[in-house]
Amino acid sequence: MSLIVGPFLSNWSFIKKAGTIILLSTIVVWFTTYFGFTEDGFRMLAEDEIDMSILGKIGQCLAWIFIPQGFGNWQATVASITGLVAKENIVGTMGILYSAGEGSVYANMAATFTVASGYAFLAFNLLCAPCFAAMGAIKREMNNTRWFWIAIGYQCGLAYVVSLCVYQIGTLITTGAFGIGTVVAFLLIIGFIYLLFRPYKESTTLKVDTKKVA
């Protein structure tokens, strides 16, 4: 019976999530993608004006953060942000943003991402902080605001570093390009290897003389 009930409850939970949080956030993404402020005031934008939208302006302000990862464009940046609401949102956001303009979604994405930057984008969003619901669960379990933010910061920092290494090393392999970013990536990888294989040291323990205690 549990083999039937377990999957059913999991699927039902996803259906409720898809029908509420994901649907609502997709509507918000669509609205902020096609509306913005222009010289004519606040209005709905044409396909070739999407970069002037509310979402476009937000993404453009933050896109520079992901330049070392190879996906420093506002569309990918916004998709990563909406992934904090629910990871499934990334698919819907990418579909909306890259369907604007000429060509298909896949053609527009192929023109924006290289193989290395595509894998870097996936690595970042797979390893970064989970959705808001999971963050809430982490905070409840830790029961400490300070350690909660440390955990979230660690996840985002690890995702950023791994994503950078994936892009820089991937670019070196596919194109042969070598730069400062490649050097940084190699140094980070060396640091990871050291942390994995460094000798384990016993922590200092307190020795108690049981005879004196007795």
Question: What is the meaning of each model-derived region?
Answer:
Residues 195-211:
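Membrane-interface capping segments at transmembrane-helix boundaries
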